[in-house]
Regions:
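A non-catalytic alpha/beta surface segment that caps or lines the substrate-entry region
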Residues: 22-70, 74-76, 80, 91
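Zn-dependent metallopeptidase/amidohydrolase metal-coordination segment
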Residues: 10-11, 269-271, 346-399
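Active-site-adjacent substrate-binding region
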Residues: 236-253, 260-262, 309, 319-371
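Short helix-loop-beta-strand segments that form the rim/entrance of peptidase-like active sites
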Residues: 153-175, 256
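Flexible, glycine/charged-enriched surface loops at secondary-structure junctions
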Residues: 19-20, 48, 161-164, 247-262, ...
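Active-site metal-coordination/substrate-binding segment of hydrolases
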Residues: 67-161, 391
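N-terminal capping segment at the start of a domain
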Residues: 2-28, 129-130, 318, 378-379
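Midchain, well-structured core segments that form catalytic/ion-binding scaffolds
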Residues: 126-139, 171-295, 299, 309-310, ...
């Protein structure tokens, strides 16, 4: 099956994860795609194929005879799509020989604009796949799933010699728990790659350190006519907290390795309010200073008003995998050689986010991230080219060949 055929098939399944649910999977609908992938792996003849009770799919393509001593490599993608935008009833638009201009998204009437996504110019002449503007596409990360499945099929049909190849498809990556129940006792790769990036030829091995932070604010509500020196307006305290953070250290004002505080939700009234942030930085020391800044705000507010007015809860999300990859540089070297073998120069940029691979790296499985050829993830302007997906398939195959040398 062609890689784009797989993508169009997989995006027809609604697999949006639910950030309000703490179970894994966070949405039962992810099992529908999991069942399809389980069967496809069985149909390809893989061994140790299983779909777990928590919606993880695993499979093993055993080593070619005489190659059992070669290192076992793994490839991992996630089945869920981001809850940021609808992933239900996806209606892809397929544009052969794309002309390099703005694209009308016929369902919404919006345009995918070259001015907003300059990389569109590099896709001129290719077959472009977009949304119709009413949903996201789901290339994040069903493109990765499609590319892994297609690469495995081609490795088998082309009789490419290889060591053990482990395949893993996870739920709930988009809500930060995709690696929580990943079974490394079952998935016996020495190293692996998530296929969950964007640029063709990308191998990413540096990501944010990440945490979520929640300020719970308890106010004092009395009649406004008798409120002097008594009332504490929790909503106003929340505004004050937001004002104490640097206004130029938000996602809209930062790039590259610059970190940020991101206000994700603010709700409440006079009696009670809640202010939620995510905190990100590539540098570990700077990241810890950011968390200390939040703790300082909590202390300041409780000193200004009264004890227990503000309670801060910080939850660690993931760490920068660079700390692990620096001790396992061969994993990146293999990927870069594979990318060069398909005629591209490797692209390695700091990821302004995280992947399952970041968590897995700290669990003992070095796991950089490979590009899928997709862009504009998490919204209606998501798009990908067939040729970019073909390139990702080729990179996976080259990694397998190099690992078997």
């Amino acid at each position: 099956m062609r890689v784009e055929e797989r993508l169009l098939k997989y995006v027809s399944y609604w697999t949006t994860s639910d950030e309000e649910c703490r179970q894994i999977p966070s949405s039962e609908r992810q099992f529908e795609l999991g069942k399809v992938l389980e069967q496809e792996l069985r149909d390809l003849g893989l061994e140790k194929v299983t779909l777990t009770d928590h919606c993880y799919v695993y499979g093993l393509q055993p080593a070619t005879k005489g190659y059992a001593d070669k290192p076992a490599v793994g490839f991992i993608s996630h089945m869920d799509t981001a809850p940021d935008f609808s992933g239900k009833d996806v209606k892809p638009q397929i544009i052969p020989d794309y002309d390099g201009n703005d694209v009308l998204l016929k369902g919404s009437g919006a345009y995918l604009k070259v001015s907003d996504f300059p990389t569109l110019k590099t896709l001129k002449g290719r077959t472009l796949i977009t949304t119709d503007g009413t949903t996201l596409l789901g290339a994040d990360d069903k493109a990765g799933v499609s590319e892994i499945m297609t690469a495995v099929e081609q490795i088998i049909t082309e009789k490419i010699p290889h060591g053990d190849i482990w395949i893993g498809f996870t739920p709930d990556e988009e809500v930060g728990s995709g690696a929580d129940l990943f079974d490394l006792d079952y998935f016996k790769a020495r190293f692996a790659y998530t296929v969950d990036g964007d640029y063709e030829g990308e191998v990413a091995y540096e990501n944010f350190n990440a945490a979520s932070a929640s300020f719970e604010i308890n106010g004092v509500n009395v009649h406004p006519g008798e409120a002097k020196d008594i009332m504490i307006n929790a909503a106003l305290v929340g505004c004050e907290i937001a004002s104490l953070l640097p206004e130029n250290e938000t996602p809209a004002h930062t790039e590259g390795r610059e970190g940020f505080y991101h206000l994700t939700d603010f709700s409440g009234d006079i009696a009670h309010a809640k202010v939620n942030y995510i905190v990100r930085d590539h540098d570990k020391a700077t990241f810890e200073k950011r968390l200390d800044t939040l703790r300082g705000i909590e202390k300041k507010m409780n000193e200004k008003y009264h004890a227990d007015t503000v309670k801060l809860n910080i939850q660690h999300s993931y760490s920068n995998m660079l700390e692990v990859i620096e001790k396992n540089e061969y994993v990146v070297a293999i990927a870069k050689k594979a990318i060069k073998n398909v005629g591209l120069e490797p692209v390695s940029r700091p990821v302004r986010g995280g992947t399952d691979g970041a968590r897995l790296s700290f669990m003992g499985l070095p796991c950089p991230n490979l590009g899928t050829g997709g862009y504009g993830f998490h919204g209606p302007f998501e798009h990908i080219s067939v040729e970019g997906m073909d390139t990702a398939v080729s990179v996976i195959k080259e990694i397998v060949k190099i690992t078997a040398e």
